[in-house]
């Protein structure tokens, strides 16, 4: 139950003798909560000086009252939940060009992942183009995109290399660059 919560708030469960419940008159049951059993009052009393002699204490009941430690209360789950999937870690490119990374599980290197004995081998990494991660695109997807955009009717498509040279002013104008200038 919530015995540990009641103790944290300063309450304890007190049992009253049956004759004390009858001394309050016929309307005493109206003030009782619906879960109170025979011989129990409201069940919760603020801690204070005990009215009678203290009950005998047991060694394990000091922190939890007469009920002992809560058996069903666990602050953390005993068993971690099963993982939704298995993640495969792959080594990353070296942070500094020209310097090789230490192999996994080597001294000074990162600890490598330990695959499960029944797990299949991870798929090979995608090929990188120009040192950047690239995702290969299916030829059928490109063909359907070409048809959808109407590019199949165009005889010659301009080459687009954004970020490398958006415009080359000297090749467009057909003249040589002035001496001592830097080309775009």
UniProtKB/Swiss-Prot annotation:
Location(s), subcellular: Nucleus; Cytoplasm
Region (Disordered) location: 18-67, 94-128
Major localization listed first in the record, in broad terms: nucleus
One Pfam family hit: CITED
Reported tissue expression: Expressed in most tissues examined with highest levels of expression in heart, liver, skeletal muscle and pancreas. Also expressed in bladder cell line ECV-304 and in various breast cancer cell lines. Also detected in both in situ and invasive breast tumors where its expression is down-regulated and mostly restricted to the cytoplasm of malignant epithelium. Down-regulation of expression is associated with elevated levels of HIF1A and increased tumor growth and angiogenesis.
Top-level taxon: Eukaryota
GO terms under cellular component: cytoplasm; nucleoplasm; nucleus
Stretches with biased composition (Low complexity): 18-28
Alphabetical GO biological process terms: response to estrogen
InterPro entries, per database record: CITED
Pro residues composition-biased segments: 104-126
Single GO MF annotation: transcription coactivator activity
Family named by the database record: Belongs to the CITED family.
Subunit structure: Interacts via its C-terminal region with the CH1 domain of CREBBP and EP300. Interacts with all TFAP2/AP-2 isoforms.
PANTHER family to which the protein is assigned, alphabetical: CBP_P300-INTERACTING TRANSACTIVATOR 4 (PTHR17045:SF5), MELANOCYTE SPECIFIC GENE RELATED CITED (PTHR17045)
The protein's name: Cbp/p300-interacting transactivator 4
Taxonomic source organism: Homo sapiens
């Amino acid at each position: 139950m919530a015995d540990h919560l009641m103790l944290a708030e300063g309450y304890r469960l007190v049992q009253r003798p049956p004759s004390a419940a009858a001394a309050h008159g016929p309307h005493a049951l109206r003030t009782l909560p619906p879960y109170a059993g025979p011989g129990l009052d409201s069940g919760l009393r603020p801690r204070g000086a005990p009215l009678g002699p203290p009950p005998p204490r047991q060694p394990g009941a000091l922190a939890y009252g007469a009920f002992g430690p809560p058996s069903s209360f666990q602050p953390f789950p005993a068993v971690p939940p099963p993982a939704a999937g298995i993640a495969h870690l792959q080594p990353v490119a070296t942070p500094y060009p020209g310097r090789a990374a230490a192999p996994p599980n080597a001294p000074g290197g990162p600890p490598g992942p330990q695959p499960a004995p029944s797990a299949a081998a991870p798929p090979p990494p995608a090929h990188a183009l120009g040192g950047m991660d690239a995702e290969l695109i299916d030829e059928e997807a490109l063909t359907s995109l070409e048809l959808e955009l109407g590019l199949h009717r165009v005889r010659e498509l301009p080459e687009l290399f954004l970020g490398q040279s958006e415009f080359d002013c000297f090749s467009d104008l057909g003249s040589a660059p002035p001496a001592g200038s830097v080309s775009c």
